[in-house]
């Protein structure tokens, strides 16, 4: 992987990630393909909305269908028929989301499979082995996602174990040609975040991710972390904000120097009839759309807006038709890609401030201040 910085406007960066399977223009949003598929989308339709990289879930693909099945095809690219880059998360977040079903030790995590109840173990070495089998272009280290809220002592213990697991992940990654990203933890505590970052830099990674956000904390707390943390990170490595989020969160992350994002929000909200537009969120199942012959968004170039009315989308949603979820997903993912393209163009032109002001004005929202 090669990362180039092409332009900068304030703290916001315009860059490019290059892989043998293709390039990714940054800032970039990665659609989430948990089971090797972006829900409701074919691989071609994911390309059509402008995505250049997708995210796969190590934990879920390991449990089902299993690496043995995927390896019979080659790797995840061959299995899912996606010939562009793939980032795989390590499985850590999903393991720690199991609550009482898991037991954390220094070695890793013992848990019962949510698929069949079998006893399973995953540690850094297992996670790296699975991601190697998947043929991931970007591999994430195995870490513990610090919960919110957490005391400073709890966040410190978690962060220190994640650093030890990061070193084991680095060793287990070995001579793999895939890029390996470290994950900064430390909860809401700047000193712990700084220690985590320094520890990861000492180990050495191709990119760095900000973990432990979008885990239930107020948005103000998230922005506090983003106000200082990206600025501490090296200029020559890509910066990835994990699991975030709303369109406004992407804009705020980019303003603070983040390069990469992923979130299930555009696909999950689409399946529930919540559609993103420049003027805000449209709840398509509301009765006001029943007779509307207008497109969902007049200036949107997605297949949904180019061919179907709000009335038809409303009808599909009320009937629970799968086409409704598919058309909604096409629009939401295209909307996210259009926001990212707008941010890239604005950074190149040095007009990010004007872009941000217009973005919030169309929503009737004030522009959140940046830290001095």
From Swiss-Prot:
The gene is tgt. Keywords: Glycosyltransferase, Metal-binding, Queuosine biosynthesis, Transferase, tRNA processing, Zinc. Signal peptide: none annotated. PANTHER family: QUEUINE TRNA-RIBOSYLTRANSFERASE. The active site is at 89 (proton acceptor), 262 (nucleophile). Binds 1 zinc ion per subunit. It is an enzyme of class 2 (transferase). GO terms for biological process: queuosine biosynthetic process; tRNA wobble guanine modification; tRNA-guanine transglycosylation. It comes from Chromohalobacter salexigens (strain ATCC BAA-138 / DSM 3043 / CIP 106854 / NCIMB 13768 / 1H11). This is Queuine tRNA-ribosyltransferase. Homodimer. Within each dimer, one monomer is responsible for RNA recognition and catalysis, while the other monomer binds to the replacement base PreQ1. Pathway: tRNA modification; tRNA-queuosine biosynthesis.
